[in-house]
């Protein structure tokens, strides 16, 4: 297990993010998905492969989080290997290259988000197949190296169901054993994490957290 650095969230997840599996983290904009992924990598003390498809990764934010926790910002930045694919084909090449790049020095792989370029394309049928292949590569990496792979996902509004759902829900749901949803609350800075699926933890559990200069913290801290 890889700790998130948040006691209540670790307890919800059964100790942290599972090794050897894909964990999907999804939710609306600005709910803390990227912050959670970055914080987990920061606190791991090892290298992190971060695939940023939306330009959401901020070196300044990582430095702020490290400094606020008494860690060396430069050392923290040096541990993050950043990739910025510009389209779904480049994303495929980047994810494929991770099979050769990941070594025992790495503690985590993050794809943020897996569906950003997917939504920009029109040929949904072929892209669903392409997305499935990329997820299979990520699952291979997770299993081979016994590390967590975090797959961050966006949401869309399903008019028929009258609620938001994760993009490419079936494709990701088939391969992601653990699914965590993040949502906003009316109170500024406060968020809720809901465990929608887990290999051994009860589904539907939830915890509250806040976003601070340190990253993500328990609301009681």
Swiss-Prot record:
SUPFAM superfamilies: P-loop containing nucleoside triphosphate hydrolases
InterPro entries in alphabetical order: DNA_recomb/repair_Rad51_C (IPR013632), DNA_repair_and_recomb_RadB (IPR011939), P-loop_NTPase (IPR027417), RecA_ATP-bd (IPR020588)
Highest rank taxon of the organism: Archaea
Keywords: ATP-binding, DNA damage, DNA recombination, DNA-binding, Nucleotide-binding
GO molecular function: ATP binding; ATP-dependent DNA damage sensor activity; damaged DNA binding
Any one Gene Ontology BP term: DNA recombination
NCBIfam families referenced in this protein's UniProt entry, alphabetically: recomb_radB
Family: Belongs to the eukaryotic RecA-like protein family. RadB subfamily.
HAMAP family tied to this protein: RadB
Function: Involved in DNA repair and in homologous recombination. May regulate the cleavage reactions of the branch-structured DNA. Has a very weak ATPase activity that is not stimulated by DNA. Binds DNA but does not promote DNA strands exchange.
Record protein name field: DNA repair and recombination protein RadB
Gene that this sequence comes from: radB
């Amino acid at each position: 297990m890889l700790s998130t650095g948040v006691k209540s969230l670790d307890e919800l997840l059964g100790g942290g993010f599972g090794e050897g599996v894909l964990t999907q983290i999804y939710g609306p904009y600005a709910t803390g998905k990227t912050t959670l992924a970055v914080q987990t990598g920061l606190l791991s003390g090892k290298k992190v492969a971060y695939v940023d498809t939306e330009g959401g990764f901020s070196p300044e934010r990582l430095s702020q989080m490290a400094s606020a926790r008494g860690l060396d910002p430069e050392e923290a930045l040096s541990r993050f290997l950043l990739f910025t694919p510009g389209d779904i084909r480049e994303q495929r090449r980047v994810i494929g290259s991770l099979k050769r790049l990941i070594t025992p020095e790495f503690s985590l792989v993050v794809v943020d988000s897996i569906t950003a370029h997917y939504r920009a394309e029109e040929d949904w049928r072929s892209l669903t197949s392409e997305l499935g292949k990329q997820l299979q590569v990520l699952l291979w990496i997770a299993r081979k190296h016994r590390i967590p792979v975090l797959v961050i996902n966006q949401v869309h509004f399903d008019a028929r169901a009258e609620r938001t759902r994760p993009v490419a829900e079936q494709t990701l749901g088939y391969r992601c054993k653990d699914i965590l949803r993040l949502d906003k609350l009316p109170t500024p800075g406060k968020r809720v994490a809901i465990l929608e699926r887990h290999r051994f933890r009860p589904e539907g559990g939830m915890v509250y957290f806040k976003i601070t200069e340190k990253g993500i913290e328990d609301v009681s801290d």
